A protein has these predicted regions:
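Catalytic cores of secreted or luminal carbohydrate-active enzymes
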Residues: 205-226, 564-623, 627-649, 657, ...
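Extended acidic/polar, glycine-enriched regions
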Residues: 181-185, 249-327, 677, 686-726
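Accessory beta-strand-rich segments of carbohydrate-active enzymes
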Residues: 26, 38-42, 59-61, 89-92, ...
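Intrinsically disordered, low-complexity Pro/Gly/Ser/Thr-rich segments with frequent PxxP/GP/PP motifs
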Residues: 273-289, 646-679
Length: 1018
């Protein structure tokens, strides 16, 4: 190890001695992260710009040793080259295959990690060439080249001369090319490696693409121009008045700089002219009671910076200014003095078509969805984003945790981490420093993150010290630092995937720092069960201030199937030889195409900031709590509804909500107990808070919060049971089973004792060959698979049901069919009892008796399943909806009357087939055809059910080889109805072992499910 370190240090020394020169070895030299690259500055537009985006000539080789040389020469023959869009990723344009791995590098399994060296084999190299014209008007100006994002590195030539080199795939590489260009036609050439020594710091959990992900452009600026500007707002101790420190760096020809601060209406707030000395100058404005910036109130001022050479203004630059403070005091993160809640999500820059190439329109769409979903914070996991993202977060109000492009997860932690490698100290520091220098002026950036899953050691300690010295106005966080030196090098306790007990233990044990999980609630597939529990704790403990859900959007890549449907591809879909972690990159709150997953509604509900508490609903009295920290509720109106058995019987509106931030106020809704329908089985009250006027990105009438309250709860037991019927019923028992029939109906039981046919008025309610059977299994969710429940609970998938009793008779005018089964694999017995009256209505009891001495794994569910003909294609129900919901994910699913298509029950945006479509809290559930004829199910307790055009086996990916996609499933010509006394929850703590909370599991034991089947005939 020491010998290797000395060799690396020697290489570093040689790099310093040869600064500015190209050796051709830079891509495996950690001491050389750039050649001739300009220092990073804050983001601003200045001068005349010429985009080089578009189609470039392109050449690709599979192995690095095969790369062409001399490509920068003007007369190089590129006639045989192909083409590549810029921006554009190679793998999405026909060059190489997309690779996804979570932990480990894309060469995993084929090359042993040996930093700084990377493989030659499969290290693709892309070479680019194009011409561009320099306008004559640019003569005498400084001309700069900016390459927004190049993975993993880039060499640059202009007109046959070497310009420079850059690493760090997620920050722009900028070069001064003034001396390299000429008026008229010029040639630029780039060469990029898929992997370089910097790749060891870019082991993020995402698609491993190569190419140019952001724009390439030229800028021409006067010789007298602004080099950089730093803006530091400071609020006084009362968070009322402010100062604004402005520091500028200029070129030597600048004689004066005019500073003008304008408010949102364009009015002048303050102005000053300064004369830089040695290219530097500064001034401090005093601003009385400025409008403050926060995610709730994104008030922006504009600073105009007019640069003059003594003869006139040569350049004017603008910067948005947000007056806000960030500090940590008494174990709380404070914004403008308030302990804000971080209702966050982690977000990769990812597009289902463009990969790393994300348009401004897509960014705005993402922020709009965040606003709709009540998300107020985003972590730029795990690298600095496109500068436009921060501009938009400033404008629309999103708190940002800005994360450096440092992740070396594949190297492991402990002594192997690159955080302890001297050779990589420069790269750690450079990536953090350049991020801070670029994004320092954005009010939306409230926290710096030094990286992600890159171990802990001296390299991060140095980064922490530099950031705190340069920018004491913001806290610094880093997850791995939580566990090192008592968290000395992180200002926030920012763990990943702490469970409820661990969060509560920290929060109630006199904490010294705020707890904000940088990743929590892993949203993979059908997930986010238990999100409400996290937020019960957040709202209980002042130092627990929220976290960032992993993650915002599935990373699937779009593929259009022959029938027009879209499948979203994940790791392993492109070849069978690259390393892959399969679908583990699809953990989004939303789908790749930005469709909401059902659990998105749970996020929206738990993240809302207006809460209602019933005080006395018999008099319509409620209390409204404003959880916001900076805005009142005057922009919203409350709409309320009084419902009887799911139907609105009275409604009203309160349009003048006057509740200050963090305050409560009582209101009286326009109903009393006299309005409660005496015959109604259930009385509900719905409240919703809606925008009175259109806001940026949100339409008038958008619902920002809602809740439901039960005034009179539905009693499922009341009236449950067979109604008396004078109509005759007959039972016939023979060796092939039993038949029970009345005057207009008949049912048939197979020789195994299962209900196998149900005919009413000549209409078959059950599909041919189907049976009403017990069901203990579900198609595993991603969380189930991660916990290996499909293996651990496999005994319940298709347990043998050994018939030991089958009796059928008429008792007191009711047909009674009794069956008893032994389940030897699970050491239990199961009794099914059917009582059928003369109207063909059926009361069924499913009773399992467990062996208390046996050790048997949990069940997925305890219920029944039957198959109906496909013409029964609608569900009408009274229960929770309208989206799917489960025992631990139902806070956003309100009770109501719903009518839906069977074809819409399965959420077809899950990238892999899995359990979907269940609706809980059911009072009754009806599956009907277009004429309204079908079957109603009700029980003596609230139950859950689904009706899908797919069998459970169709959705069970454990039945099939890997790489299953919903888009390739074909709906069956049948409707599969599942209904349960209990079904396991979903969980969300993580997707690789954590189970749902204990109260939401279905443990082995005794169960009794009493339900009724009632024909619905119209």
């Amino acid at each position: 190890m020491m010998k290797k370190t000395l060799l690396i240090l020697a290489a570093a020394l040689s790099g310093v001695l040869a600064a500015g020169a190209q050796t051709g070895r830079e891509w495996q030299d950690p001491a050389v992260n750039e050649i001739n690259r300009l220092p990073m500055r804050s983001s601003f537009a200045a001068g005349e710009r010429l985009s080089l985006d578009g189609v470039w000539k392109f050449h690709w080789v599979r192995n690095a040793s095969e790369r062409p040389s001399g490509i920068g020469a003007v007369d190089y023959d590129d006639a045989a080259w192909g083409s590549m869009p810029v921006p554009g990723m190679w793998e999405l344009n026909g060059y190489g295959d997309p690779v996804y791995v979570n932990i480990g590098y894309a060469w995993r399994g084929n090359f042993r990690n040996d930093p700084p060296y990377v493989p030659d084999a499969e290290n693709h190299v892309g070479s680019y060439r194009r011409t561009f014209d320099i306008p004559a008007s640019w003569g005498g100006k400084d001309i700069f080249l900016s390459i927004g994002s190049a993975t993993s590195n880039v060499y640059v030539w202009v007109n046959g001369r070497f310009v420079g080199y850059s690493e760090d795939s997620k920050l722009a590489a900028q070069f001064d090319i003034t001396k390299f260009v000429k008026p008229g036609e010029n040639l630029i050439a780039l060469q990029m490696f898929r992997w370089s020594d910097g790749t060891y710091l870019e082991d993020q959990d995402f698609w491993r693409f190569a190419g140019i992900a952001r724009g390439v452009e030229l800028t021409a600026r006067d010789k007298a121009h602004l080099e950089d500007v730093r803006i530091t707002p400071v609020l006084d101790s009362e968070y009322k008045d402010a100062t604004l420190r402005v520091e500028v760096e200029t070129t030597p020809r600048v004689k004066s700089v005019g500073l003008t601060l304008r408010d949102a209406a364009g009015g002048v707030v303050a102005e000053h002219r300064l004369q830089p000395a040695g290219g530097k100058g500064g001034y401090v404005f005093e601003v009385a009671d400025p409008a403050k910036w926060s995610a709730e109130t994104p008030n922006l001022y504009t600073l105009e910076i007019a640069v003059s050479d003594g003869r006139g203004v040569t350049e004017t630059v603008t910067q948005p200014v947000g007056f806000r403070s960030v500090e940590i005091r008494d174990a709380q993160l404070l914004v403008n003095g308030q302990p804000v809640l971080i209702k966050g999500a982690d977000r990769h820059e990812m597009d289902p078509v463009g990969g790393y190439v994300v348009s401004r329109e897509r960014m705005i769409e993402d922020i709009r969805i965040m606003k709709e979903m009540n998300i107020n914070a985003v972590r730029t996991s795990h690298y600095p984003n496109d500068p436009q993202w921060y501009e938009l977060c400033d404008r629309y109000g999103i708190y940002v945790v800005d994360e450096a492009n440092v992740e070396s997860h594949g190297m492991g932690y402990g002594d192997n981490t690159l955080a302890k490698a001297p050779a990589y100290a420069q790269a750690h520091m450079e990536r953090n420093r350049r991020m801070v220098l670029r994004d320092k002026n954005h009010p939306s950036v409230i926290i710096w993150s030094m990286g992600n899953e890159a171990g802990m050691g001296p390299n991060f300690e140095a980064c922490y010290r530099w950031i705190k010295e340069y920018d004491p106005s913001r806290p610094v966080h880093y997850e791995r630092a939580v566990y090192d030196q008592d968290g000395a090098f992180t200002d926030i306790i920012c763990p990943m995937y702490w469970g409820y007990e661990q969060c509560e233990k920290y929060a109630c044990n006199n904490p010294s720092k705020p707890l904000i999980q940088c990743e929590y609630a892993h949203a993979m597939g059908n997930s986010l069960g238990g999100l409400d529990h996290y937020w019960e704790l957040v709202r209980k403990y002042p130092s627990y201030q929220g976290g960032f859900i992993w993650d915002f959007v599935d990373q699937g890549l779009a593929r259009y199937e022959p029938d027009g449907r879209v499948s979203f591809l994940y790791g392993g879909d492109f070849n069978d030889y690259d390393a892959t972690d399969n679908s583990f990159n699809c953990n989004g709150i939303i789908a790749p195409d930005r469709t909401w997953h059902p659990h998105a509604y749970e996020v929206q509900r738990q993240y809302q900031s207006i809460w209602t508490t019933p005080v006395d609903l018999t008099q319509g009295r409620v209390e409204v709590y404003n959880e916001n920290f900076f805005i009142g509720l005057d922009a919203y109106e409350m709409e309320w509804q009084l419902l009887a058995d799911g139907r609105v019987v009275k409604a009203g509106r309160i349009g003048d909500l006057d509740v200050a931030p963090q305050q409560r106020r009582a209101y009286t809704l326009g109903f009393t107990a006299a309005d409660f329908c005496p015959q109604a089985k259930e009385i509900l009250v719905n409240v919703a808070y809606k925008l009175k006027e259109k806001q940026p990105l949100l339409d008038i009438g958008h619902t920002v919060a809602k809740q439901q309250f039960v005034v009179r709860e539905y009693d499922c037991k009341a009236g449950f049971g067979l109604a008396a019927s004078a109509r005759p019923v007959e039972v016939t028992r023979w060796e092939r089973g039993a038949r029970v029939e009345g005057d207009t109906w008949q049912v048939f039981f197979s020789r195994d004792g299962f209900l196998a046919a149900y005919t009413v008025d000549g209409r078959e309610l059950m599909a041919e060959g189907a049976e009403l059977r017990p069901q203990f299994w579900r198609a595993p969710t991603e969380n189930d698979l991660g916990a290996r429940l499909h293996q651990r609970q496999a005994v319940w998938k298709n347990p043998e049901l050994r018939l030991t009793k089958f009796d059928a008779a008429v008792e007191d005018g009711v047909a009674v069919v009794e069956t008893l089964y032994e389940l030897p694999a699970v050491k239990a017995t199961l009794a099914l009892t059917y009582r059928i009256n003369g109207a063909g209505e059926m009361e069924v009891t499913e009773r399992m008796t467990a062996d208390k001495t046996a050790e048997v794994p949990n069940l997925f569910r305890f219920g029944m399943t039957l198959t109906m003909p496909a013409r029964y294609d609608r569900v009408i129900y009274y229960g929770r909806g309208a989206h799917e919901n489960y025992a631990d994910r139902l806070s956003s699913a309100d009770l109501g009357l719903y009518e839906q298509r069977v074809a819409d029950q399965y959420h077809d945006e899950y990238v892999r087939p899995q359990e979907s479509g269940t609706k809980g809290g059911l009072r009754w559930w009806t599956v009907v055809d277009s004429a309204g004829t079908g079957l109603t199910i009700l029980a003596d307790a609230p139950f859950s059910a689904s009706a899908l055009p797919y069998a459970t086996a169709d959705l069970d990916v454990s039945n099939f080889p890997p790489q299953q996609h919903f888009g390739t499933l074909v709906a069956r010509d049948a409707t599969f109805v599942n209904f349960d006394l209990r079904q396991s929850g979903l969980g969300c703590i993580d997707s690789w072992g954590a189970l749902p909370e204990e109260q939401f599991r279905v443990p082995y034991g005794d169960y009794t499910f009493r339900f009724m089947l009632k024909p619905t005939v119209k």
